[in-house]
UniProtKB/Swiss-Prot annotation:
GO terms for molecular function: rRNA binding; structural constituent of ribosome; tRNA binding. GO terms for biological process: translation. NCBIfam families: rpsG_bact (TIGR01029). The keyword rRNA-binding applies. This is Small ribosomal subunit protein uS7. The gene is rpsG. One of the primary rRNA binding proteins, it binds directly to 16S rRNA where it nucleates assembly of the head domain of the 30S subunit. Is located at the subunit interface close to the decoding center, probably blocks exit of the E-site tRNA. Keywords: Ribonucleoprotein, Ribosomal protein, RNA-binding, rRNA-binding, tRNA-binding.
Amino acid sequence: MPRKGAVAKREVLPDPIYNSKLVTRLINRLMLDGKRGTASKILYQAFDIIKEQTGNEPLDVFEEAMKNIMPVLEVKARRVGGSNYQVPIEVRPDRRTTLGLRWLVQYSRLRGEHTMSERLAKEIMDAANNTGAAVKKREDTHKMADANRAFAHYRW
């Protein structure tokens, strides 16, 4: 526990093109070694691919994808009387978004398409259609929470 109290949350500035804080957070999540320009280029190219292939507004597709990826429940290990229980808990809204973005980028990187922008675009489109690895991760998380519902009374 920190002695000086909780660290204040930094306000994220919306990105200049789509004017969305969620897009900025995705750029930050994509960024490697502080190369924000490269991360921005990858994301905007992915959005161009989405617009080209779906004909819809890329930001709407992305927000729909995020809605389908963000988990509502997760399990947390609690030690009670010498044994560990996986206790299902509700996910806070800020953590929901963070997990959604993390899974989106993680499973985009594992895909087989040629460029990262293609991988990201395909994963976003899959997530918007309720398919893809990131949505599967959310479903697995929910299944795990559902399977451990018996331990829900250990929540505190």
